[in-house]
Amino acid sequence: TRNPDFEYREVKKATHTRVVDRQQYMDRLYGFWLGECIANWTGLITEMDKIGNIGDIKTGAFYTRQNWGQPDQPSIWGQGVPSALSPTIGYVFAAPDSTWGSDDDTDIEYIYQWLLLQNKTSVLSGTQIRDGWLSHIRHEEENFLWVANQRAFDLMLQGMVPPATGDPANNPEWEMIDAQLTTEIFGLFAPTRPDMALKMAELPIATVARNNSAWISRFYVSMYALASLADTMLQPADQLMWMAENAKSCLPDTSYAHKMYDFVKRMYLSGYSWEQARDSVYDRYQVKQLDGYRLTSRKLYCNGCFAGGINFASSLVSLFYGKGDIKETIKIGALCGWDSDNPTATWGGLLGFMIGKKGIEKAFNRTFSEKYNIHRTRTGFPNNGIDTFWNMALHGVWVTDRVVQDELHGSIDLQENKWYIPVE
């Protein structure tokens, strides 16, 4: 499993390195893609069904655990019609003989992995990002871009290069969720080294986000990188809490993102139900506009239902209350409200990575398709866009090879299939 476009150097086993099993990592990367797809498609059933009752669009009471397995209710743009994916709220699977479709929660990450390989680099330039977007995103609608991503793309078409495309002076949608769902994968390219992951993700995040929306994205990237460092002797819930507490350093103390983290964690540790925590998030941040979260007063479409902040707070509910159980985390995330396919995809990908392909199959007691069609939403890839999770995982290993050797000055032992990654 050598990358033919990369020169592997002689192994140097230095002191102060961490050893990561390269073969096992490939299985975990497969788990990332599979977990993200299950969670993404499950969350799409309930996406924008429930956004609260402020402004022109009112959606009634939020979902609770009682709604799982019950009829799906229409989304804010569903014209009174439930999801075409499923008449009921539940998990969405692609059977072994079918193909997973790409969506905006997986496809930009797929593009970034591809660009890192094609450009033979670990840190993409603004021009490489722009050229990649323009090559692989359809220029006409339906192009599966929204808010900040769509605005950044329009600016790229006019010749603008990141990071200018995410500057609030150019992109009024900079506070929306977009960077959170397009950049988590960078955490997996720098196992045990969130510092390097953040360096790799900095420009992709800045392509569409600034301040809180960027800090939240950095939090997710750090969580993904820290997953390789977590103590596997701990319970999954304790591993995740350790990762989250470390990733929290990405959120400045005075930011609303930091205060949201502390608030949801406090609700969780105080013994409230996840529904009570979610309802409190809605009341605190959208009704009362506390902790500096002032989006309601701006009278945005759907009261800022795509915003990075409210969806971050919602994602923390499913993170903490899911306790590392992939099924429960996806379930809570799908029922939490707002842009529910995004938090589910983020945690489905992270937990899928932590338990790997076999762990996911065991959790759901079934097997799944390993095929992925990137051309459902994007364009310009080989094999008419049909790929497999194994191939995508191998490409992820190859990206990581370059990071380990060229950026972190570690070693790759192809005989033992191990990475030797220096401690910071």
Which sequence ranges carry the predicted segments?
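Catalytic phosphate/nucleotide-handling subdomain of diverse soluble enzymes
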Residues: I38, T42-L44, M48-Q73, A209-N212, ...
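Flexible propeptides and autoinhibitory/regulatory segments associated with cysteine proteases
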Residues: R2-Y63
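Active-site cavity-forming subdomains of large catalytic enzyme subunits
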Residues: A95-D104, I108, Q113-S217
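Active-site-surrounding "flap" and adjacent substrate/cofactor-binding loops of secreted or lumenal enzymes
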Residues: I45-F93, T106-I108, R130, E140-E141
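N-terminal leader/propeptide and maturation segments of large enzyme subunits in energy/redox metabolism
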Residues: S86-A95, W100-S102, T106, Y112-E141, ...
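Acidic, carboxylate-rich catalytic segments that either coordinate divalent cations
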Residues: N3, H258, D262-T296, Y301, ...
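Mature, well-folded catalytic/scaffold domains that follow N-terminal targeting or propeptide regions
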Residues: Y25-Y30, I38, M156-P168, P172-Q180, ...
